[in-house]
């Protein structure tokens, strides 16, 4: 995705990730969509029980995971950093995950999460 020309944009930007036409469907049927605003993109992910970055996203994305900043709306996610440290992220938690980490849904309900990407770092492949 190219950087938007901010000089021609209004001072207020809005978008709906579910209608922005930027949705990725992972091999297990989980989805992640985003809306690009002026300086950041807001992602909305619905990850099914059993979804795991290393199994359902890495090969499709063609790269290791990148830094992620987000917020869990519902469901639970377990994250393992490159050093082997693990943390459960539950509803209501904001998080920042280091590049090279793995993450997976735990429990029987989907994990619904927002993520926030500065436009300078955002690419379509995310």
List each language-model region with its residue ranges:
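Conserved GNAT-family N-acetyltransferase fold
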Residues: 45-47, 70, 95
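Short beta-strand segments in beta-sandwich/barrel cores
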Residues: 52-53, 75-80, 103
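Ligand-binding loop in jelly-roll beta-barrel domains
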Residues: 98-124
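Short, conserved beta-strand element in jelly-roll/cupin
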Residues: 62-79
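Detector for glycine-centered tight turns/loop "hinges" at secondary-structure junctions
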Residues: 29, 50, 84-86
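A short, N-terminal "cap"/entry segment at the start of jelly-roll beta-barrel domains
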Residues: 1-46, 54, 59-60
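Short beta-strand segments
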Residues: 43, 85-87, 112
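Short acidic-glycine-tyrosine-enriched beta hairpin
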Residues: 82-100
